[in-house]
Amino acid sequence: MVRKIAAAAVAALFVPVVQAAGWEKLWTFEHGAGTSVAGQTSEILAFDSLNNELWVAGLKGVDILNAATGSFVQHIDTTAFGELNSVAIRNGVAAFAIAAPIKTDAGSVLTFDTTSRSFQQSYLVGALPDMVTFTADGRIMTANEGEPLARPGFATVEARGSISIIDTTKDSVTTLGFSGYDGTTGLGRIVSPGAKPSIDWEPEYIALSKDGQFAMVTLQEANAVAKIDLMSQQIVSVTSLGLKDHSLPGNELDTTDRDITSPRTSIAGNYRNAPVFGMYMPDAIASYASGGKTYYITANEGDSRNLTDFVDGEFNEEVRVGSSSYVLDPTAFPDAAALKADSNLGRLTVTTSGGDLDGDGDYDQIHVFGGRSFSILDENGNQVFDSGNQLEALLFADPALRALIDDGRSDNKGVEPEGVTVLELGDRTLAFIGFERTFDSVIAIYDVTNPTAATFVDFIVDAESNAVEGLTAYEFGGRYFLATANEGTGTTSLFSITPVPEPETYAMLLAGLGLIGLAARRRRS
């Protein structure tokens, strides 16, 4: 069905809009049912261009799907090795990132031939490899999260976050840690009390520069990114992503989950500025080139640390503003009592590991998890663009889409942008940002060709799926595709992406000219 987003509603948001692509859903495959293995899920996926297949990583291993038809081809069981977290493919080789049964032990990377689907080699890497990718020259990289292990009755076992680089031609593994940053301050957030970067920082996701010289790694809980020199195989910098000022116009947010009228009725539209700061805390990261330079796109999901250990005690950095244990500084917040009301900021989930600027035990700033946005960073990790509150505000501005917003997450991290991938479509570069917390699967499409002025294109909405976890976009046979792994429904979906030769239009200009009928077209499954 072809439908139009009301231009007047979009124009009111002063959001640039460009129509550069159309989309159509081709198929959805349900894992764990029929020909698939019982209990299998869909979390991360990779495309094999040699065989036109999608390899989908889930709880039980990898399901291989025929990309042309969406039919099941084969299952590779990885449960004997540990927990499968990620899959990547390059030139007929698939790499699996697998956490050890005890997650603080060394993890492993397994490689397979994508044509014969036979096992090739195994490599030991750092603790809890959460993401795997290939470099331009064929090396394999893993982001090893190194989460601590907390179990009732046992002392907490610490692990070290790291990045591993595998040279398969030499069967060598180089693992990089953060001990060189233990004497530094201000580069990345420290969550656990008294911890050092070498223990506290947890690499999450990797993207590669377009010249193949560098990698950028998200350190989600630390609210930072690390830059890796792939030639010297060294960490060359760690850059804090700073804080998002939600008191500024364009950064409005919904702070309460108490304005729903029924389970599927969305927010009442109470987006507003508030005296809080968001920690961007990106999960996924992707890269692209513009003007001869590399830029990185981050999905600013947010994350917190919560450990339950009956020997060492419990650590949970989450608290609501309205909690009596969360004391606001009376000078910074003379209206603290009003702010703590549930109708104001009282329901908002914040961190206890930041905001006490003078160390006196009360909070001079309110820090929330995630940016509820995507950002574009330059080659050194400096922000050149942030989508502000567009991802949620654009959904709400469309009467046909606002019911997809789960108001029960407003007090947490909103729609939680988690996954991101990019696609070069002619002379344009499109970014696809997947939301984890909407009732149906929602993916925002932005034209990011100009990295300092990204423009909204469309929403992809899939009523058969929800909780988009992984995305990959690719070209095959002269056509363009987007594949999504939908964790909530255990499904994988494939969409065709089609260029639309339409000149750029800006919402502010539309409002000024009164062209309220002009809108971004979209198809909805």
Predicted regions and their residues:
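Bacterial N-terminal signal peptides that target proteins for export
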Residues: 1-6, 505
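A short, hydrophobic C-terminal helix/tail in secreted or cell-surface proteins
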Residues: 502-520
